[in-house]
Swiss-Prot record:
Any one GO BP annotation for this protein: histidyl-tRNA aminoacylation
Reactions this protein catalyses: tRNA(His) + L-histidine + ATP = L-histidyl-tRNA(His) + AMP + diphosphate + H(+)
Signal sequence segment: none
UniProt organism field: Acidiphilium cryptum (strain JF-5)
Gene name per UniProt: hisS
Record-listed E.C. numbers: 6.1.1.21
Enzyme class, UniProt record, top EC level: ligase
InterPro entries (UniProt xref): aa-tRNA-synth_II, aa-tRNA-synth_II/BPL/LPL, Anticodon-bd, Anticodon-bd_dom_sf, His-tRNA-ligase, HisRS-like_core, HisRS/HisZ, HisRS_anticodon
Subunit structure, interactors included: Homodimer.
Name used for this protein in its record: Histidine--tRNA ligase
Family per similarity comment: Belongs to the class-II aminoacyl-tRNA synthetase family.
UniProt-listed NCBIfam families: hisS
Length: 411
């Protein structure tokens, strides 16, 4: 019989992969808490309109990648392809637009139908941070600083470069869009098929092209910096000043536009050279219209998301897990005492496992297999004396001690 396999583009996260995944989440959760973020959990599926209307009808995610289906009531629902839209929906649904700003951390699975490749899956996992209700560029810098600190504490920050850009406000984007279309229209016949479509529907997305010839044409294209109105230029200058105050290095990259249509002003990506062409490990930007599009009042916001699988791949080593203590009763008569000792150790925060089966040799082999740091041996003589034998497995040293002293001996 053929063994069942996970669906293409999905994976089982177990063993070393699970430890790496857990380490990324716990590090991000702890650092986000230092910035005042509260953790939210939103549903993994939403009404399709939450994504289709708000991510941009021309975005690749909406046009090509969403897992959308009708439920048994005929309602169109979609497995979430990203986290920001759901968080903004939750803010409005729960009446939290009057208690701003809100800083939100989230983590969990996302779903996109795209070609699986290194570090990219159809079910993947993200961590994310949103700061909603803050209109100042300092909020953008603080969100970026949080992302930078997470990368640093994971030990991967030194190999990653922060790229920033501004998309300006609506007036600035309109002026830039006109200049960009005027320029690219002269070379329309040379553009890739995808960029020809984008030239009509969403010209700024051409800046995100991966086509080599498109990139060549863009080298001489107008830059948005020349089309910013005073307010947008001041916002961008404020962002750069705040990043410098945080001690965060960055490069300006006029091609950073991100994949969703809800962004304005700030767009940024942390890029690694260790993951090939798809090198972005954390990215985001400002979205000042998204909450209003969800039915809430005009509410500014800024945030980012990062792929857990991709960050886990960058870790230099698998995080160590606490080495347990193996509790080994020599016979059935000692099992009750073994259970009592297991309970005592675990309540004291010491990882402990029991080795019940086989002879003493097999039980010690199991203790070594689970990488136990010590074994607590309980025989009939020790039981009668209210004692145990503590064996240190790295060096084989052992000694008898009263049960009452076991916790202190194990530290």
């Amino acid at each position: 019989m053929t063994k069942p396999q996970p669906v293409r583009g999905t994976q089982d996260i177990i063993g070393e992969d699970a430890r790496r995944h857990h380490h990324v989440v716990e590090t991000a959760r702890r650092v986000a808490g230092l910035y005042g973020a509260a953790e939210w959990a939103t549903p993994v599926f939403e009404l399709t309109s939450v994504f289709a209307r708000n991510l941009g009808e021309t975005s690749d995610v909406v046009t090509k990648e969403m897992y959308t289906f009708e439920d048994r009531s005929g309602e169109s629902v979609t497995l979430r392809p990203e986290g920001t839209a759901g968080v903004c929906r939750a803010l409005v649904s729960n009446g939290l637009t009057q208690t701003l700003p809100q800083k939100i951390f989230y983590q969990g699975p996302m779903f996109r139908y795209e070609r699986p490749q290194k570090g990219r899956y159809r079910q993947f996992h993200q961590i994310g941070l949103e700061i909603i209700g803050a209109a100042e560029p300092l909020a953008d810098a603080e969100a970026i600083a949080c992302g930078q600190q997470i990368l640093d504490e994971l030990g991967v920050g030194a190999s990653i470069t922060l790229h920033i850009n501004t998309l300006g406000d609506r007036d600035s984007r309109d002026a830039y869009r006109t200049a960009l279309v005027d320029y690219l229209s002269r070379y329309e016949s040379e553009l890739s098929d995808e960029s020809k479509v984008r030239l009509v529907k969403n010209p700024l997305r051409i800046l995100d092209t991966k086509d080599a010839n498109d990139i060549r044409l863009l080298a001489e294209a107008p830059r948005i910096y020349d089309h910013l109105n005073p307010a947008s230029a001041a916002f961008y200058d404020g962002l750069k000043a705040a990043l410098s105050a945080f001690g965060i290095a960055f490069v300006e990259n006029p091609r950073i536009v991100r994949g969703f249509d809800y962004y304005n002003h700030t767009a940024f990506e942390f890029v690694s050279t260790a993951l090939g062409a798809q090198g972005t490990v954390l990215g985001g930007g400002r979205y000042d219209q998204l909450v209003e599009q969800m039915g809430g009042p005009p509410t500014p916001g800024v945030g980012w998301a990062a792929g857990i699988e991709r960050l886990a791949m960058l870790l230099a080593a698998t995080p160590a897990t606490p080495r347990p203590v193996a509790v080994i009763p020599m016979g059935e008569a000692e099992q009750t005492a073994a259970i009592e000792i297991l309970a005592t150790l675990r309540r004291a925060g010491i990882a402990a496992e029991a080795a019940y089966r086989g002879n003493l040799k097999k039980r010690l082999e199991r203790a070594n297999r689970i990488n136990a740091r010590a074994a607590v041996l309980i025989g009939a003589d020790e039981l009668a004396r209210g004692a145990v034998t503590l064996k240190t497995l790295d060096d084989g040293a052992q000694r008898e001690l009263p049960r009452a002293e076991l916790l202190a001996a194990l530290g």
